[in-house]
């Protein structure tokens, strides 16, 4: 079995910061900043997901992409990636996350509409918001 040699950090409402212990409370409902650290060793950008779905689903999506990179697959902004969900691809878009470029996983809504579609459902429609604008207020954890 392949070794997962990266980490996933989830910054979300109700989650205590591992560094300072403060509990996050500044994201809109259903939004978070989940991302990997460790893809650099594969000469690949890390991944980010901003929909606050279950931690298990976040882990599944980010680890599935990480395992594919570990196996030699390379992704770039604009790619439509099959095989994460049975009924639709996900798209990878380039975003900044704490000063580094990441590939954000963009998941279509229940009608398979991506966020640029004016009929895209919330919270899926929120996925194109820049990372530094995801929070509702300046507070939050360190």
What is the predicted function of each stretch?
Residues 1-31, 39-142:
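Acidic, proline/glycine-rich low-complexity IDRs
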């Amino acid at each position: 079995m392949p070794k997962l040699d990266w980490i996933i950090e989830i910054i979300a409402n109700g989650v205590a910061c591992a560094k300072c212990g403060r509990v996050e409370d500044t994201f809109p409902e259903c939004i978070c900043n989940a991302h990997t650290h460790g893809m650099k060793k594969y000469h690949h950008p890390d991944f980010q997901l901003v929909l606050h779905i279950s931690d298990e689903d976040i882990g599944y999506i980010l680890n599935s992409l990480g395992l594919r990179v570990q196996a030699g697959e390379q992704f770039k902004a604009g790619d439509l990636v099959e095989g994460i969900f049975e009924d639709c691809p996900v798209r990878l878009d380039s975003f900044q996350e704490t000063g580094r470029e990441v590939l954000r996983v963009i998941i279509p809504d229940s009608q398979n509409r991506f966020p640029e579609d004016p009929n895209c459902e919330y919270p899926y429609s929120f996925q194109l918001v820049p990372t530094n604008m995801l929070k509702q207020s300046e507070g939050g954890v360190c």
